[in-house]
């Protein structure tokens, strides 16, 4: 509630207007004042902040309180009468002002109600005005339209003139319109009108019948036309369908032709890539053979030592051949780059053409065609990957050739050549063996001065081996190969061996020469020695030279070692090879050492063979298929024993990863037993000559063990020897010849990796037999 400022006129009488004030009367005051509430009010704050709410709360208590009985708290005297009068006057004024405020509020409410009623009436008037305006607009439009119609009729009347009159056909009277004419006929000519009406009805009936007949005829014609149209549309649809079928048939024929053409091109491209791949493989094998021939000139191995050519002309010739090989490799690389570029351009053009054709026929291509296109693309990508892999293989082989040639030149300068002469007497052979020991000491000293040579070529040879295996279809990380893969790789390996033999012109003659030499020496030594019989159950002692070690071709896999005695008819099949070092020209020859008998159920311990071994991977001419073939030649009853071998003091353990397995006596042919006896007699003869080895230099390795040392170590397992990476295919071919000569009766049972007996717990496959190099 708000307070209004009252003027003198407002206080003296009622406000102006029709509104009349209600009856006013002052109320009696009987309430006592609440001093505590009054004391809590801050008057200054209320005046400063215009706190009307506080005034509204206290207005009733102040206006209607009684102060007559109030006394002073200090002096206990009543209130001053004058002050009391002023307070009562103020209370009356406030009460009157409240009454005026109520009257004004009621007046304002009444006026607001009247205002709302006026506004509603005004709105209704505006709506009525709008409606009337719409009606006026419609009336005006109707009036305008009628005026136009009247003017049009007037013009027509003026134009027609007298012809617009209606004349009675029964009399001469004329009327303005047809209504008047009909009225005239009904009044004057009633009978004739009925006759005329009947005639008109009859005429109308005839016309109606005629129209019905025409309608029926028209409907019949329309139905015939519709039927003809349907037949025509059906014929057109049939023709369109026939054309679509023919077009689809032609498209299918064209599609089949294109598909056959595409497959033919893909087959041609595959055949081309395969021919190129074979050509490159043959060239690589030829280059590797030439490289090995160059290396064999600097290191030719035999039973008694290393044969070296001292002529400088040969070295110059080898250097020239190496340079020619490098030039051929450069020419081949350039040719391959050109061919690769042409193939890429051709494939890009074909791809663009196929993409355009695919975009044009994308709507009609079926799912099998899309699969065929994706398969062709995968074939193309696979062929491209093979080409890239072949290019990388060529680059790696070139780097290998350069590295090996550089190493060969350095080692040839450092290592003096030793010429082993063929002497028949035992004294000359002993002198040759002593010279060979001195040569080996020099080699070890050279390697000890530069031990980095041992580890320089390991990554290169590993990469070369991995790439060659991938080129043969064996992926990286494969733990083994199946029999089907072996059968698939056998023709390729056989072809490579034949190509290797053809590329090395002196291969057959050299093998025959070695066969004759070994046969003659064996016969001479056999004549001078007596055959020592072996007790039953004791296997014949074999030379460490006759142990052929298979090579590890995949990471973390180990293969069996085949120990085969040579036959008397073909001594070349067991031609021993010296343990080769990591580099060409660094050879080492070990003499056969007797192995003492150890009583056991079926085990034959082997004395630890001295010598150095090569990294556990095959050369370029011995792929994985040869490994499997060599493993299959081992007899079934074999219990190999292996023991960890101490490492040399100059880091030779990086390449010592092969183990040695001994062959137990079993059911074999008489030829094998006789050859074992022959080898045993040769061992005993050589053992007598090597009882006192030469003095070992400081830091050297004793390559020949004494017999008593062999007896002391009879219980320790032996490790396998291993073929070096620079050996030729002579051992492989000899082993293959031996496998063919064994025949169906003497052929040993293949011992696969997956069918090992349970007693092979201490086999070379066990992880505890020897610490292995990580990744090999």
UniProtKB/Swiss-Prot annotation:
Chief location of this protein within or outside the cell: cytoplasm
Family label: Belongs to the DZIP C2H2-type zinc-finger protein family.
UniProt biased composition (Polar residues): 652-683, 709-721
Zinc fingers (C2H2-type), renumbered ranges: 166-189
Recorded name of the encoding gene: Dzip1l
Coiled coil ranges: 196-450
GO annotations of cellular component type: axoneme; centriole; ciliary basal body; cytoplasm
Subunit description: Interacts with SEPTIN2.
GO MF annotation list: zinc ion binding
Official protein name in the record: Cilium assembly protein DZIP1L
Modification type Phosphoserine: residues: 425-426
Any one of the GO BP annotations: cilium assembly
Function according to Swiss-Prot or TrEMBL: Involved in primary cilium formation. Probably acts as a transition zone protein required for localization of PKD1/PC1 and PKD2/PC2 to the ciliary membrane.
Basic and acidic residues: compositionally biased ranges: 685-694
Chain spans, region Disordered: 520-776
Listed Low complexity bias regions: 600-618
InterPro entries found in the cross-reference section: DZIP1_N, DZIP_RILPL, Znf_C2H2_type
PANTHER family: CILIUM ASSEMBLY PROTEIN DZIP1L (PTHR21502:SF8), ZINC FINGER PROTEIN DZIP1 (PTHR21502)
Cellular compartment(s): Cytoplasm, Cytoskeleton, Cilium basal body; Cytoplasm, Cytoskeleton, Microtubule organizing center, Centrosome, Centriole
Keyword list, A-Z: Cell projection, Cilium, Coiled coil, Cytoplasm, Cytoskeleton, Metal-binding, Phosphoprotein, Zinc, Zinc-finger
Pfam family, one: Dzip-like_N
